[in-house]
A protein has these predicted regions:
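Linear, non-domain "peripheral" regions
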Residues: 1-119, 125
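Conserved structured core elements
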Residues: 3, 168-169
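N-terminal start-of-chain detector that recognizes signal peptides
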Residues: 11-15, 44-51, 158, 185-189, ...
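Short capping/connector residues at structural and topological boundaries
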Residues: 18, 70, 106-107, 165-166, ...
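Glycine-rich, small/acidic residue-mixed loop/short-helix segments
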Residues: 24-34, 39-41, 231-252, 256-261, ...
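Secondary-structure boundary elements
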Residues: 80-84, 89, 96-166, 174-176, ...
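Hydrophobic/aromatic-rich core segments of domains that either
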Residues: 170-260
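Intrinsically disordered, low-complexity linkers and terminal tails enriched in Pro/Gly
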Residues: 194-200, 276-283
């Protein structure tokens, strides 16, 4: 499958702002089941992009906006060829052993409520892979997915469970927190999801055809496997993996000291029409 992606982020600054340091994570990597055919990154500011890798091996670009300016616009655009690997990840850049991804963060803390939720999966299944699938099903049935901006600060694991509804990022936080409690390494993934029907002008499901978050968990004998509890399935050829970290903060597509953020995202089968999904958030 070939997926055409366009991701535009515009961030507002205080009028006359100068010397703003910016980091963007908007460049995916190739791995088994995902091949980057072409990819470009454009800015509305005349500055020099410095390419580098972060601690997790994500491709990043850093730059400084000298100013004065009141906004910054970043456009990532390209085409990716994907294949279905039944969610099993091979050929990804691995900077750390799986055990590092047992570490909790503020967004993935295993509170008593999260622990009780995770223990339900332990009671129904004995083997790690079965527990991960049971966890995905239970989460899908417990927390309703609601569309939310990728830059809007997903809920913590505890907040998502307590509210009973969350965007894909909050759901991924709950899955990773619960899996880590069970002793199964889990990590946060950002990326894109194309609709299954190439003729769909508009996505029929929330979060389809736009930026999305999901989780990967490590199962002995299998390795890393992607789990999208919001949709109750493992990754397919409709997913494009962008960045990996311990939680949503680590995969943020843009980090700076700006104010309001707006983004427009499309991720569609190259055979079908293109439709932009819009989001807006306040930092």
């Amino acid at each position: 499958m070939r997926i055409r992606i366009r991701h535009e982020i515009t961030q507002r600054f205080d009028p006359g702002s100068r010397n703003m340091a910016v980091t963007v994570r908007l460049t995916p990597r190739s791995h088994e089941g995902q091949f980057i055919l072409r990819w470009t990154l454009d800015l509305n500011s005349d500055c020099r992009l410095a390419a580098q890798e972060d601690a997790f091996g994500n491709l990043c670009h850093t730059f400084s906006v000298d100013g004065p300016t009141d906004h910054l616009s970043v456009v990532a655009e390209g085409e990716v060829e994907t294949q279905d690997t039944t969610g099993v990840m091979h050929g990804t850049v691995e900077r750390f052993p799986p055990s590092l991804f047992l570490r909790q963060t503020d967004l993935t803390e295993a509170t008593p409520a999260v622990v009780a939720f995770a223990e339900g999966a332990r009671l129904t299944e004995d083997d790690p892979l079965g527990q991960l699938h049971a966890l995905m099903v239970a989460l899908h049935e417990t927390v309703e997915e609601q569309e939310g901006p990728a830059l809007g600060g997903p809920l913590s694991a505890h907040a998502a469970l307590e509210a009973g509804k969350a965007c894909s990022g909050g759901i991924a936080h709950l899955f990773t927190a619960a899996a880590r409690h069970l002793g199964l390494p889990a990590r946060h993934i950002s990326g894109y999801l194309a609709p299954e029907d190439p003729e769909e002008g508009e996505a029929k499901r929330e979060g389809v055809g736009a930026a999305r978050h999901w989780a990967e968990a490590y199962a002995p004998k299998y390795g890393w496997i992607s789990f999208d509890a919001g949709r109750n399935l493992c990754g397919t050829e409709h997913y494009v993996r962008l960045a990996v970290a311990l939680d949503a903060m680590g995969v943020a597509p843009l980090r700076s000291a700006g104010l309001e953020v707006e983004e427009q995202v499309s991720a569609l089968d190259s055979r079908g029409p293109q439709k932009l999904a819009q989001a807006q958030s306040q930092n």
